[in-house]
Every structure is written in C-alpha cells, then in structure tokens.
Amino acid sequence: MSAPKFGYVLLLIVLINISNNGVDAFHKVFKKLQSKSTSLESVSPLHRTAYHFQPPRHWINDPNAPMLYKGVYHLFYQYNPKGAVWGNIVWAHSVSKDLINWEALEPAIYPSKWFDINGTWSGSATHVPGKGPVILYTGITENQTQIQNYAIPQDLSDPYLKTWIKPDDNPIVKPDNGENGSAFRDPTTAWFNKKDGYWRMLVGSKRKNRGIAYMYKSRDFKKWVKSKRPIHSRKKTGMWECPDFFPVSVTDKKNGLDFSYDGPNAKHVLKVSLDLTRYEYYTLGTYDTKKDRYRPDGYTPDGWDGLRFDYGNYYASKTFFDDKTNRRILWGWANESDTVQDDTVKGWAGIQLIPRTILLDSSGKQLVFWPIEEIESLRGKNVQMTNQKMEMGQRFEVQGITPAQVDVDVTFNVGNLEKAEKFDESFATKPLELCNLKGSNVNGGVGPFGLITLATSDLEEYTPVFFRVFKDAASNKPKVLMCSDAKPSSLKKDTGTDAKERMYKPSFAGFVDVGLLDGKISLRSLIDHSVVESFGAKGKTVITSRVYPTKAVGEKAHLFVFNNGSQPVTVESLNAWNMQKPLKMNQGAK
C-alpha cells in the first residue's frame, strides 16, 4: 500500500484539529468517564432542551431504525446507559403515538453474542411482508471486525415491540470479499424489486480514501450476496457512515414515497455522513434498477461541495416512510458543542432534532425540509409583528414570549436589490468562508438581516441567524447567503489547550437557491435553550447550532430582528409562539 499524498494527510489533520469534542473525525474514547453515571437527581437542567427528544440523562448519538408499526412510532438510538460520553453503546428504544410524546422502553439490542460482543452500532428497519419489521445493524466482534446482523421481534402482535431476538444464524454479511473490516457499517433500510424478486440494501465503507456504498442482494432476507459493483463511490471522501437511499416524487409536492417505489416521475436520493468532516452530503440522481447503478444528476455537486440535509451541527440522520400520512420523515442527531467536562458534570449529552419532512423542491435540483406539523401542537402564547421597516443598524425586540423556548417564523421583504453587493465567484463553493468574512455586524448593501437569538439585552451574548444578498455579475441574479454564527453565543472562557477542554463555537453557512422575484424570503427558527434549528426559504437551506450562553439563559434571554444593511428591510410578518414541554419525554429511561 502506497502512502497517501502529503496534501491529503495535511487536510485530514486540519479537519480533525478544527473539530469539537462531538463534531469530530472519530468517536473519542474517554474510558475513565464512559461509565461515570449521573443520578437523575444530579442531572443539570442548565441548557437542557424542553421540547426536543432526549432521555433523562447520559449520552446519545445516532437515531436508528425509525418506523411506524401498528399505529405506534418507534425510535431506536445509540445510547450509553452508564455515562455522558460515548461508550457502552446499546440500542435504546422509545415509542410514541404522535412523534411528540415519548415513552422509554427497555433497550432493544445490546452486546451479548459473539457477533456483537464489542458493539451494537447503527442500522435500520425494514418491513418484510410475512415477517414484520426486521432490524439490520452493525455488530463488532471480539477482534473488532465490523459485521452486519439482523434482529426480529419476539411478538409481532405487540405494537410496542418490546423484545427483540438476535438469531444464531447471524451474521448475514461479513467483510470477506475485499471490504475493509474496520470500516464497514450502518446498513440501510432495504428495498424490494418486484421485477427480479430481490431485496437490496447498502453498507457504508471506504477503501483507502475513497468513500463507498456497497450493495447487497437477497431473496429471503437472510442470505445476502454482494453486487458486482458498489452503488456509488467517491474518491477523497473517506468513510461513508449512515448511508440512506430513497426515492422522491418529481410531481407530487405533498407526499413521500416508499423505499421500494419503482414507478415513473421519481428521483433517488443518496445521502452519506462523512466521517472526515462530520457533515452530511446528498446527491439527487437516477437509479437504474437493471444495472444497480446510481448516477447523480450532472448539476448536483458530488463530494465535499455537495448539498446537505443541514449545514450545521447535524449528523447520522435516518429517514423512514410513514405510510399512515404518506410522509418521508427525517431524524437527525445534534451532539453537544461544549466540553467533555461540562457534559460529565451536567450528566447528559446529545439530542435528536425535531423530525423533518422531505420533499423535492419545485426546481427538481434540491430537497426541502420542514418540521413535522405535529410540533405545532406544542405552541402556546403567540405574538405578532407586521410591516415593521428596519433601517440600517436597527433592531427590534420580539416581546411577550419566552425567547429561550420558542418557535418563530418571519417573512422579510428586501425591496430593491440594486444595492446588493457584487458576488465574488471565488466563494461559489465556500459559503462558510464568506460568512466568516462578512458576519452579522459587517455592514452590506442588502443585509445582513435576520434574527438575533438567545441574546442578552446588550448583546454581550447572542447567536445571529441571518441572510446577506449578493448580486451575481454574470447573470445579474441574486445570490443569497444564510449564516448561523455561534462565535458570540457565550462569554464562557476556555482555559484548556486540548480540544475536549474548549467549547466549539463555529459559524455555519449555506447558500439559498431563491430568486427573490417578489423580494421576500422567510426564516423559521426553533429555539430550545441550547439549540437553534433554522429553516431558510421554507426549508431550502437548514442550519442547526448548539450554543451555551452564560447570561442569556431562561427568562433572561432575548429575541430580536435586525438589519445591518444599507438597504431598508421590512418585517412583513412575524409570528412567535412559546413552546410547551411534551407531556412525556422518556421518563423512566435507564
């Protein structure tokens, strides 16, 4: 094996060094802390979310095998029952009737047999006719080899699927055909091809620095055979974790499609979570069922410049098809961005973000994401603002709500675009660099304008979420940048030199593909104490930030709208709702 090129090695070093303790290149192991349990009485409420999914204590990461069975929603997730750092991982299991209120059950899968004795890692669920739901998951053997196993419910008549069995004929897929046994994990939901009678599923992997999604085929869901070629791969992308592969309708703008849909008017989505960057990328393309090949559309970037489900703190996502409502629903994990010491002291780490629906944008060139409508059942007191004109340097406070726990939806009208700054094409694939260069306090022509969240009254601490409009010189069309900037979010001083001792306060950014023909652009943010989920232009661009203010906490937090561009911007409409806690959120979880 030849050594990788110096440039690539240097890139890896940079990526790892800029990472935080959670959004890093690998799971960091803190053996002294991974079994340091916290009693329920000792769990710190500071920065703990109110309406997001999380257990009462300890560490969580990847959402696994979401599904609907006999009217009950199921979510499994990677969980450490003994501490607030990664380790001792089991498949925790929660159930819900409405995707809002959750009841914790006993862990469904945990290390117990030779084929998973050193780990039960991520996977997916598939509804198999005549067999019910089948979970495919990655097991870690005694010699640290990653293999693929299956588990089945003990009682199919139980809508809660409380008990799962791991049959002795596991594993079903082993890395014995040229695969990398140390990077071979996270099987997808399988899909069925009626024409040839085979099930198919993907497993993420890498070969040297090439990311790969291997395909496997089976008639009986037990004996799986590797396809002649991967469904897709890409050089210099490293390990592909948590792949997801599903169709979206080209014509139906309201409903999702089942994994096995093979009809007309559909495109396929291939999503991968890049272990190198800890971001998720997706492509839209065509899936040839005869050749088992997936080809991204020519206009869809493939690789590190690709489209993302979320441009912020968002990883290891997993979708499922809700056949009750005909929706494709997306779950995603947001780890903490504070320090390992903070996580250990507070006794918990990680949340699942609000589930989102997925549809194909009317352009056919990207997906759009939106919080599930069920979340609106938690809305309480509402305040509104209409036709509020903001000159350069002005900001207005949104009063009468609890800004640390709120759902705010605002539509801005930017009016005249003639004063928009000229767009520098050298930033065409570098929205983050542009956001860092032109932050919320850097005056522009049209923008920056947006929301100032989790702020003190004097802006000692604040997390701005904002737009800045540029003008493309060649086409004379607007180029819209969306940013969420955590750098000013907290006054906490970092004293350590190691990454685990420093709070991660990054900027996140993405471009928004919107024409602004009517001069309007919307921004919705779900704010929940230490998380800000923001949806630009009705979900064309989504950014999640984790933040930890020291003063803008609870009732001391403030919410503003602002404009720092020379061109006036009007708040055409703003609605903000206090958000209530669900009645149930995994009480009783171990």
Curated annotation (Swiss-Prot):
What are the transmembrane regions?
none
Q: Which residues form the signal peptide?
A: 1-25
Where is the protein localized? Secreted, Extracellular space, Apoplast; Secreted, Cell wall
Please name the GO terms that the record assigns under molecular function: beta-fructofuranosidase activity
Q: Which GO terms describe its cellular component?
A: apoplast
Give me the disulphide-bonded residues.
435-483
Check the record and name the InterPro entries matching this protein. Answer: ConA-like_dom_sf (IPR013320), Fructan_Metab_Enzymes (IPR050551), Glyco_hydro_32 (IPR001362), Glyco_hydro_32_AS (IPR018053), Glyco_hydro_32_C (IPR013189), Glyco_hydro_32_N (IPR013148), Glyco_hydro_beta-prop_sf (IPR023296)
Q: Gene3D superfamilies recorded for this chain?
A: Exo-inulinase, domain 1, Glycosyl hydrolase domain, family 43
Q: In which tissues is it expressed?
A: Expressed in flowers, and seeds.
Keyword list, A-Z: Apoplast, Cell wall, Disulfide bond, Glycoprotein, Glycosidase, Hydrolase, Secreted, Signal
Pfam (any one): Glyco_hydro_32C
**Glycan attachment points:** 118, 143, 180, 335, 564
BP GO annotations: carbohydrate metabolic process; plant ovule development
The entry's family comment says: Belongs to the glycosyl hydrolase 32 family.
| Descriptive protein name | Beta-fructofuranosidase, insoluble isoenzyme CWINV2
